[in-house]
Amino acid sequence: GSSDFLAVAVREVKEETGVEKPFPQSGAILSLDVLPVPAHEKHGKSVECHKHYNVTYGLIVNPKEKLRIKPDENSAVQWIPVENLKEMVKEQHMLPIYEKLIARMRKQKQMQTEVMAQIAAPLLTWYPSHARDLPWRRTKEPYRIWLSEVMLQQTRVEAVKGYYQRFLENFPDVQSLAAATQDQVNKCWEGLGYYTRAANLRKAAQVICTEHRGVFPDTYAAVRRLPGVGEYTAGAVCSICYEQPTPAVDGNVLRVIARVTDCFCEIDRPAMKQAVTEGLRAVYAEGNCGMLTQSLMELGATVCLPNGQLLCSACPLAAFCMGRKNQDVLRLPQRTTKKKRRTEQYTVFLMRCEGKYAVQKRQEKGLLHGLWEFPNVPGIHTAEEAIQMAASWGTAPKDLVRTAEKKHIFTHVEWELFGVYLDCGRAAEPFVWKSPEEIAAEISLPTAFRQFALDLP
């Protein structure tokens, strides 16, 4: 009864064969056929001759997936090499149909490859008049391009602009960044999140100064070896700064390519990213590598948007976009099922003594390791329990000023935070005690804790 034939095809493959993760090669219908079915017996009952109206799609399955017999539908399920099909097919009258469908799947694959080969020219024509004026696009200096790409990971462009300018004012080159303390770098990064990026920036700057004599490396392999630099960042730096054919493939680019080729492979699988990277490498034009990288980024950020925002009429690739032709844009890209974000609870202590508040560096490995924080303990405790804990730390709590509930969301975890503001009689160790002005000027607090600092009485 469903009108979504593709969804029915995927469901039937799962039910008939037992495979768990089939995906369409394309959303296009391979064939529409009317097939006569002769009279036969099924489960001991006579079935009169009739017709099957077949809508056929080509699906891809990992051959390592286990097959399962469904007794009421089939007696055997197995993988058959295409070259053995003729010998293995029991119903020889179906062989021409199967051969036709296999040929069409191969044709679909060829069309997807041909579409990839067409994208460069229209993108290079479109980009100069549609590119946003962003500060890091006014340079090809590798230090600045590298910095911008690291900042833009998991962060909106508008949020990055101010941080980018401020960071360069404090650390205008790789030498000044290498010479800075991690606290100085973190303070400049404060509020941008994902502080591991800031730590790796400083480590990479030190590597550049010690191993490359302060000169930013100019090969993909050398850039890739820098701490915290992945395939995407290395590809962006080398294509934009050095005009090397090194694609920078992120979620935006994967979405564009999945749609333009009508590819249903889950984009967060490494094999998909690798295939797109190799496909793009083949179409990079000498002398235009940087512009092609930036045009793909721009298209994914401004036109080929996620979440059902269709701007296909403004897309330079619309004329040959297979996803648009097959009306699959809203289906794409496909992703693996995300795990539900877990929730953690903490009680946060805002302990004040003579106008100064207790802070400490986070010792726990993992999230926010090594960063400044207000003292905290797992779980949501009552104010009375919190006062007892503060007393056990030697801070001599005198008055409960107030409490506050906050929340902070990371990529994979959500923190529920209960803040307890206490007036204390003793600035106990090992806490470091800072005034609100000193906190604002000297130390970097992650956003989860900085939201409490904004409300300090």
Language-model segments: what does each one mean?
Residues 2-93, 383-456:
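Unchanged
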Residues 86, 90-109:
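C-terminal tail/extension regions appended to the core domain(s) of diverse proteins
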Residues 12-16, 73, 149, 298, ...:
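Acidic-residue sensor for enzyme active/binding pockets
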Residues 122, 126-311, 320-322:
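Catalytic cores of DNA base-excision repair glycosylases
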Residues 107-133, 138, 301-457:
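Intrinsically disordered, low-complexity, charged terminal extensions of DNA damage-control enzymes
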